[in-house]
């Protein structure tokens, strides 16, 4: 079942200086199936960040539409957007975005607190999740007391605590060392196998090689895509590297 549909998305900005029109997206179209793990790649300025902001209901396209389970994001009333994001989307950021004055436990539970859930409901949702992610032993610590990898695991737990329809990850390995990055990517594979739909924007070939499909954006359009098929991570890594070389040299992918 298609959980996300992106149809002919366009986005035009007015430049801050000079007033020129800048077209960041020029007609992006793709869909994501429930349970898929999709990575989006592209050079700086290709439109990845603009697209992610639209998918996160943080911005609206100037043309086209985005539908999550058949619901148009641009049709949601402004007053309802925060609740929609909280109930349907999970977010994992490069810089973790944990609150230093909150314990790890309180950071994870924050979306449920904002949703008005009972203490019993919150504990029931959190306990199996933190055990699965291997952070049940750091819940009473504060973010500044744990490692970068543990912070990112806590951020993933916070993103998944509401059982989101779609998990959006923005450069999730960008602030991690190689060991913590590998750990996080294995964790993403695990939660994806359990049925979580993931859409990840990344510059990292290694991170993208863990996905089931990779979309490449160039000059505001989807330029090419690769399906994993039966490829290993190493084989997919090479395919991605070859495609990025084509992007940089301006040649078309075969």
Task: Annotate each PLM feature.
Residues 2-4, 9-213, 217:
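ABC family nucleotide-binding domain
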Residues 221-245:
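Conserved beta-strand-loop-alpha-helix hinge in the C-terminal portion
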């Amino acid at each position: 079942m298609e959980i996300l549909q992106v149809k002919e998305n366009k986005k035009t900005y007015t430049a801050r200086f000079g007033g020129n029109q800048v077209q960041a997206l020029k007609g992006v179209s793709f869909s994501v199936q429930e349970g898929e793990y999709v990575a989006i790649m592209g050079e700086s300025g290709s439109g990845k960040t603009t697209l992610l902001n639209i998918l996160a209901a943080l911005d609206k396209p100037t043309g086209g539409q985005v539908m999550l389970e058949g619901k148009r994001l641009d049709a949601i009333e402004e007053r309802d957007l925060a609740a929609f994001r909280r109930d349907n989307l999970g977010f994992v950021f490069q810089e973790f975005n944990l609150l230093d004055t909150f314990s790890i436990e309180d950071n994870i539970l924050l979306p449920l607190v904002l949703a008005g859930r009972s203490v019993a409901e919150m504990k029931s949702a959190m306990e199996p999740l933190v055990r699965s992610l291997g952070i049940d032993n750091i819940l009473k610590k504060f973010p500044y007391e744990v490692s970068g990898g543990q912070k990112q695991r806590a951020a993933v737990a916070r993103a998944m605590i509401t059982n989101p329809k779609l998990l959006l990850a923005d450069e999730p390995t960008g602030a991690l060392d190689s060991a913590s990055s590998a750990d996080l990517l294995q964790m993403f594979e695990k939660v994806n196998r359990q049925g979580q739909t993931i859409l990840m924007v990344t510059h990292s070939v290694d991170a993208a090689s863990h996905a089931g499909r990779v979309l490449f954006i160039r000059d505001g359009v989807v330029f090419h895509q690769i399906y994993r098929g039966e490829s290993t991570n190493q084989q997919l890594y090479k395919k991605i590297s070859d495609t990025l070389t084509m992007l940089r040299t301006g040649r078309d992918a075969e």
